[in-house]
């Protein structure tokens, strides 16, 4: 599977999960450098989401985990890491991301990022930290 297909699968899984949770979701019609989706609970205010997808965990020093590297772009409000084999999501504020991370896929790992396992709630309005600027309708 090529990286474009893998990335598209991750984006669609995140989009479906957000819709199930009641979020408004918008997808840019062209590739935007810095984010893949816009999502929010109000149709007029969105978070910019960068989606990163890993297909299977890899072994490193006797343990297995999903490895994400070369994380350079910081134009989004949140990164969502998709662990395909575990069907798991980590919703992480961009300012909490290092250049590379390892995730267990089930929230049990040692990384500080593990606390963001399944943390969809941080995208809701009660979580005012990391809120993006308002995106207004074109009407």
Regions found by a protein language model. Name each.
Residues 1-33, 38-139:
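Mixed-charge (Asp/Glu-Lys/Arg
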